[in-house]
Amino acid sequence: MEDKKVLLSIKDLQVKFRVRGRILTAIRGVTLDIYENESIAIVGESGAGKSVFTKAFAGMLDSNGFIDQGDIIFNDAELSDTVVPLNSYAKKTIASTWEKLNEYSKLEYGSEVFLKMKALEQEKEEKMTLSEEEREKADAEIKELVIKRTELFNYKQTLDTSKEKAKIKETSAEISRLDGEIKALQKAKEEKIKAHKQAAMNDTAYNQAYDAKMAEYKKEYAGLTAKEITDETRKRNEILAKEIYLSVGRYKLRKKVRMIKKLHEAFKAAMERGVDLNDEQKRNGVFDQATFRVRYLDETPEQLHGTCIINLAKIQDPNDWGQIRGKKIATVFQDPMTSLNPIITIGKQITSVIMKHQDVSEVEARAQALELMEKVGIPNAEQRFDDYPFQYSGGMRQRIVIAIALSCRPKILICDEPTTALDVTIQAQILKLIKDLQKEYNYTIVFITHDLGVVANIADRVAVLYAGQIIEFANVEELFYDPRHPYTWALLSSLPQLAERCLLYTSDAADD
């Protein structure tokens, strides 16, 4: 893979879900590079995290799911290249931002003293509340009871109100008892905090020493932050001001103003704490608090030009996902009938996707749709263009789903068990179609499956997923002929060994 470009780089990815008052981890520290024009299979049992993993970089996590940590860097030159018009509003905004950054930069001179003041404030706050050990102990006791209460409440929801009244009454009483204990523990915690606070307020010697030290720090800080900044810092801030505008240039006016304000606050806080903004990683981190950073490259009198690192783990705006999902990363799901709208014609479903992501007329979209239908093997495409999904067989519906996925020529095609709901005789045809079209469209296949037989036919490399972790990663030949992990051995051993059974039967028959 050394000669191929990394298309998607996943580093230490963790995906979690909020479920019934708990946080559950579905993906645990996955690191993986996916290359251009390759076929990679993600295999594992049901519940291993295969679909969640791919949904994380397709922006399709359920509402209770979130990326807790990690990066998903998507390398796409077209999306990375950013051009923003340099109109009067842009010039005025950049000038205003530059002026503010120059003012904030004075705070960098006093960053060491600022951190000392914050540390002193933190020390006083800790003195006025529980120690870390006391807090952890109190929180652990409360959390244990809350978990018990949640489990009982969920259990109560499963009981039959007409047949299990006694159990419901007993469970309700236990829930009420736990509620009382939780309130008592919370009250005890609050009283301890009040006692600590009162003791700290009555400590006259400490308070006098604190006030004197804080006054000393404030005087020193005022002197340091009164200095003028250097020309080098001004030049840095000019570039930063342009990068801030480049980074929010794609938003509508109201959101643009809101995001600029958020970035101003983020940079002020960073300068107060002495963050080295000449360090690319640290600068990116400041931008990530609001949006991903667009790095300044050059400009003309009419426009600013920049480039960005697209970190899919940090994208929050639905409009940003609209530029990626479908257009750059497409998905073929397991059941074609649930992927298609039953009351809209096949042709309309394909053309609507084309028109959404491409600047084409309905006539041009129809021509593209017919061409795609022919390429995926739909006979008499012109006659079947206005048919509804129920008029197609399962295999034909899946071919249409593939056509929709490929309509915008994506860089990555995620195939989430696309043959599971199909007849065995159709599965091989769909797999062959996906591989054949890859040669023409040059997309990367990410194939999710629990069927190792499918892996052998379609994949170049295989990642074995277990409990949200990649426990083995190898090319197809190595995985089948030299598996290293016991779980991989078990998966391979679960395959039917028809040849061996036949041989044993023949041997027994010969002995007879």
Residues covered by each model-derived region:
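Catalytic Walker B motif of ABC-type/P-loop ATPase nucleotide-binding domains
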Residues: 413-416
